[in-house]
Regions:
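Catalytic cores of nucleotide-sugar-dependent glycosyltransferases that transfer UDP/GDP/TDP-activated
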Residues: 1-168
Length: 168
């Protein structure tokens, strides 16, 4: 939680306010909560959107209820992040983010079921319009520098000499 708050505080020190912050897994769930509950009334922060990616719903980052007090979040936050009498950082991310992604379209569907949702399926179903699956890795057909129509000079591993032309 400290890292999440520090990351948001750092934005002001750098005078850098991104359009989107991409949060990965339960460790970054607090950033979404801090942004909405504490920072959102401050103009530069109010425009920042969050994308929360979950790779595996089994890992939920569950802590004692007193964690909320230590984090400095408002008391009403409890109703949004309570999970079986504990605070769930995963739930913080899912509830407070603007968009949710996961590792595939199939997994995005599966985690909305009781079999794979690990207790979060209700939240995910209620936010299904903001949930998508994106396959890990690169699409080598769509992103092939030997055939890509959007680059100036085509190249491949056997002939990388034209790669530099695309950086001019």
């Amino acid at each position: 939680a400290f890292f999440s708050k520090a990351a948001l505080d750092m934005l002001a020190m750098l005078d850098f306010y991104p359009d989107i912050i991409h949060c990965n897994d339960w460790q970054t769930g607090p950033l979404c909560a801090y942004l909405k509950e504490i920072y959102s009334h401050m103009m530069p922060y109010s425009k920042i959107k969050t994308l929360y990616t979950s790779h595996n719903l089994q890992y939920q980052g569950r802590f004692a209820p007193s964690t909320l007090d230590m984090m400095g979040l408002p008391g009403w936050t409890w109703q949004n992040v309570e999970f079986y009498d504990s605070v769930s950082f995963m739930k913080m991310g899912l509830v407070y983010c603007d968009y949710i992604s996961t590792v595939s379209e199939t997994y995005a569907y599966e985690i909305q079921t009781s079999e794979y949702g690990y207790g979060m399926e209700g939240i995910l179903r209620s936010r299904a319009d903001r949930l998508c699956g994106i396959i890990n890795g690169i699409d080598f057909v769509a992103n092939n520098p030997a055939t890509d129509k959007h680059i100036v000079k085509h190249f491949d591993a056997a002939h990388p000499e034209d790669k530099a032309e695309n950086k001019r």
